[in-house]
Amino acid sequence: MRKFFGTDGIRGKVGAGKMTPELALKLGWAAGRVLSRSGTKKVIIGKDTRISGYLFESAMEAGLSAAGLNVMLMGPMPTPAVAYLTRTFRAEAGVVISASHNPYYDNGIKFFSNDGSKLDDEVELEIERELDKPLTCVESHLLGKVSRIDDAPGRYIEYCKGNFPAEHTLHGLKIVVDCAHGATYHIAPSVFRELGAEVIAIGDKPDGLNINHEVGATSMGKIRETVIGENADLGIALDGDGDRIMMVNRHGKVIDGDEILYILAYDAQSRGVLRGGVVGTLMSNLGLDLALQELDIPFDRSNVGDRYVMTMMKEKGWRIGGENSGHILNLDHGTTGDGIVAGILVLAAMRRRNATLEELTENIKMLPQVLVNVRFEGAHNPLESEQVLAAKSEVEALLGERGRVLLRKSGTEPLIRVMVEGDVEADVIKHANYIADAVRNLV
């Protein structure tokens, strides 16, 4: 049974619960104890732009050093950059200090293994077992040293650009790039400019407190307004740590992760490089499933969370997968979700087919889907109550084969997520609220 790690590392409000300086220190030490048993004894740490990142960086650094591991600090860098540089520096692991799309007052800690993928569940459980032990320190001559990777941004910018075909440029495209005042603020605009695009950057002025605030992949109003107001060709919105992407076409319509998966799968199929099918999640829109069926591309669903998408992709030997929230995995172009690289791959598909973003998505029709989040912090599970199960069954009977209902607990926040999709938006909204009310009655 996990005490600390959720579906995406450890996350919570700074100074409360799990996310304290004391835990970060102990976590660094415990992880160092596990990771020092083999390998290079070298760990990379990156973070996003929230103000508490400095605090947790120092604590993790001290804990890892106390366990005898050398630490390399990247400063503010996107999560996928940590995964990439962990591989290229042959480090034993990478550490990301970020709460992704959450507000500034939250933070989190997650790990990458030496191949740039998320740590296995077994390794996380081993770290948790070490956390129960008293903290000790190696002999002074065995303490880890700390250094900085000063050229980390340049290394990652070149890596991102390398995913765009050399025979094409982005010359003539006007792109709005929303960095969510997060870890991509000094990376993403440069990547797309150097590939030839005219870039209008927003959300690129972090102050430690404004990460994800009314900007980024979870708040699309600003980028939609900017794309339309600037007469741009498209917009690319990233989240606070840069592992998620949402897009906007020239008319201001949001293009979500499901539609991006469709574009990438169709492009790979047309070039004869698609291996297998596409992995989505239980939250993926039924419209993606139906559109891929038209292309004879297999589709399967994993549990929600990019680590579970990755697990299913590896089991099936498939190369493309992701979530409608914008985590996009393409194992031919990286080991984890990468918002910038996913955007580059969509732009590459546009250039290869000489098509607009609207044209690339014209054959996928998304069904109306409503997600209602209900805050729930009780000890019992409302999803097992007769009242909620009865409401779910009632709605499923009304929707028939042209709709779905999904109820689940969030793995990162104290929320029950109620998702309903079907043909008629008004009915979908009504059904989702009906089930959500059944959950609220138990709070």
UniProtKB/Swiss-Prot annotation:
Cofactor binding notes: Binds 1 Mg(2+) ion per subunit.
CDD domains: GlmM
Post-translational modification: Activated by phosphorylation.
Protein EC: 5.4.2.10
Sites bearing Phosphoserine, chain numbering: S100
UniProt GO MF annotations: magnesium ion binding; phosphoglucosamine mutase activity; phosphomannomutase activity
Superkingdom of the source species: Bacteria
Keyword Metal-binding among UniProt keywords: yes
Cofactor field: Mg(2+)
Catalysed reactions, semicolon-separated: alpha-D-glucosamine 1-phosphate = D-glucosamine 6-phosphate
Active-site residue list: S100 (phosphoserine intermediate)
Stored PROSITE patterns: PGM_PMM (PS00710)
GO cellular component labels: cytosol
Keywords, comma-separated and alphabetical: Isomerase, Magnesium, Metal-binding, Phosphoprotein
Biological process terms in GO annotation: carbohydrate metabolic process; peptidoglycan biosynthetic process; UDP-N-acetylglucosamine biosynthetic process
Residues that, per the record, bind Mg(2+): S100, D239, D241, D243
Record's function text: Catalyzes the conversion of glucosamine-6-phosphate to glucosamine-1-phosphate.
Protein family per UniProt: Belongs to the phosphohexose mutase family.
Listed name of the protein: Phosphoglucosamine mutase
Source species: Shewanella sediminis (strain HAW-EB3)
Source lineage: Bacteria, Pseudomonadati, Pseudomonadota, Gammaproteobacteria, Alteromonadales
